[in-house]
Each structure stands twice: as C-alpha cells, then as structure tokens.
Amino acid sequence: MTVKLVFLGKLGDLAGTDERSVEAPLGWQGLIDELQGPIGEAVQQDRTRIALNGALLADKTALNAVSGDEVALLPPVSGG
C-alpha cells in the first residue's frame, strides 16, 4: 500500500527523482520525515504547494493521503 510522490520543477532536482513511492497512509509529519535534506527544507517553505490527487491543498499540513493517492509537490511560481 503506497502513495506516489511527484516532484515538479526544481523540487525534482532537489529530490534527485521525479517520482517516488512511500508507505501509506501519509500525513504532513510523515511527509517531512520521508524527505530529508534540501528537499525536506524546500517542501516546508510557505510558497511550496501540495496537491492531493490534482487538487491544491489550502493547508498543506492537513495532508492525509491513503493508498493509491498521488501527492504532487509544486515549487514556488516565479515570473514577471
């Protein structure tokens, strides 16, 4: 029983992969525990967003993923 993590943009570079499977269920603290180093720090930044099965979470600390879910980690958007 797993949850698929998808790392978009520069978060994929920090994670060293575009996708990774982790054990379900997965909450915010479990996600932080799974992601160590620069990727873990980046995910905790206010501007980094999380989508659960394609829907952006208003409060990423409310993450509650179960087996078969996809959690996408979105880097801050920049532009001019």
Predicted regions mapped to residue ranges:
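Ubiquitin-like/PB1-type beta-grasp interaction modules and other compact soluble beta-rich domains
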Residues: 1-79
